[in-house]
Amino acid sequence: MEGSGTEQKGSPKCSFLTNSLLCHENRQRLWRICNFIMFGFFSLAAYVQINDPDAEMWIVIYMIPAVLILFVSIKPDITGHVIWKLLADLHSAVCAVGAIYLSGCLYFYTSKNILHEEEGRELSGLLIISGWLLLCRKSHQSAIGAIRLIIAISVSTAPFFIWIYIYIDKEMRTSWPQHCKTVI
């Protein structure tokens, strides 16, 4: 209704065909969907660690962001809560330290594609965790902008494409350790 005072000045009306990504409600909806997709990714990543020799560590590493991101997909403003920020920052720091360690190992001991090495796949997972938690970090402070949304859509779909590539590449599967060959 025009003139009712309920419209926000400067924000386009929501409609499916026009301005769909520019509308605040649609950007917020896409942001929540991306977070739910990442919840699924982190949960699935935790599940496939079952056969890993150090499964306990990797299940925890993936389940912490899965739970944090599930909360974001349900209530995006949770990122402003001090406990959410503390857990996300602490976990990001731990993942960053692990990523630095694995990067060093890969740099000095690997000559192949890093995705062919278990440490390379672990490094990728740690970087995705840190990157996604960083992307969520200040999302409560302002409306989800187009750049953050484009990054979110790209990052939330990329792990699944990487998994498909890794799963389809027969050469890569031959170099997998035995515990990786019996998962999904």
Swiss-Prot record:
Protein name listed in UniProt: Transmembrane protein 220
Keywords, sorted A to Z: Membrane, Transmembrane, Transmembrane helix
Claim: Transmembrane is one of the keywords in the record: yes
InterPro entries: TMEM220 (IPR029377)
Organism: Xenopus laevis (African clawed frog)
Membrane topology qualifier: Multi-pass membrane protein
One Pfam family linked to the record: TMEM220
Subcellular location: Membrane
Superkingdom to which the source organism belongs: Eukaryota
Cysteine pairs bridged by disulfides in the record: none
Transmembrane segments annotated in the record for this chain: 30-50, 54-74, 82-102, 121-137, 149-169
Gene Ontology cellular-component annotations: membrane
